[in-house]
Amino acid sequence: MAKVEQVLSLEPQHELKFRGPFTDVVTTNLKLGNPTDRNVCFKVKTTAPRRYCVRPNSGIIDAGASINVSVMLQPFDYDPNEKSKHKFMVQSMFAPTDTSDMEAVWKEAKPEDLMDSKLRCVFELPAENDKPHDVEINKIIPTTASKTETPTVSKALSSSLDDTEVKKVMEECKRLQSEVQRLREENKQFKEEDGLRMRKTAQSNSPAPASAMAGKEEGLSTRLLALVVLFFIVGVIIGKIAL
């Protein structure tokens, strides 16, 4: 026996479109209209009842009236490569005289009295979703840029400070070099004087001047050694600053 044609008008007729993002509940509306002169009972069914919440999912539409049904898709991990196989069916029949127990009405309904329409579900990610994403990227990029500028400024300041320290150390090195040169000249002069004194001492056989000369040489050697150590320390400091 041929199925009775659906008397209700559906908007949309064939597809229920859900626009993402799907990280929160997404709601779409289905409008059911009753263009007849009789009241019509309806019921909305789905192949994935755990994924959707339908309000109202059943009821009676008066003659010439219409009703909006909210279909709420629950949050889920959306995969654009996965096609939705979810479907909805709007089942209807003309309301009997007694509608006090709708559960019994549906149970006692004859198959030939039932009318149904099927709709498939479509998931979409609209182009508008890309705009907030671009805004977020624009927000992130300046933030990242500002963060990268800070180390650059720090490096510049550090570099200028290092240059100042190097200049000071170089000036100190020049001063120490001059001091070493002066001490070398003094040492040379002392040696010449000591040579003369030693010759005189040898002639006079006096040990006292020899002790004095040894003390002077020891003092000069100690000062030279201290300068060499200082040069070594300065060299290490320059090496660290250069790195």
From Swiss-Prot:
There is a cross-link at residue 147 (Glycyl lysine isopeptide (Lys-Gly) (interchain with G-Cter in SUMO1)). Gene3D superfamilies: Immunoglobulins (2.60.40.10). Residues 7-124 form the MSP domain. It is a single-pass type IV membrane protein. It holds the Pfam family Motile_Sperm. The keyword Nucleotide-binding does not apply. Residues 186-197 have a biased composition (Basic and acidic residues). The modification Phosphothreonine is found at residue 150. Keywords: Acetylation, Coiled coil, Endoplasmic reticulum, Isopeptide bond, Membrane, Phosphoprotein, Transmembrane, Transmembrane helix, Ubl conjugation, Unfolded protein response. The modification Phosphoserine is found at residues 146, 158-160, 206. InterPro entries: Ig-like_fold, MSP_dom, PapD-like_sf, VAP. One of its GO terms (biological process) is intracellular calcium ion homeostasis. It is found in: Endoplasmic reticulum membrane. The modification N-acetylalanine is found at residue 2. Residues 161-196 form a coiled coil. It comes from the Eukaryota. PROSITE patterns: MSP. This is Vesicle-associated membrane protein-associated protein B. The gene is VAPB.
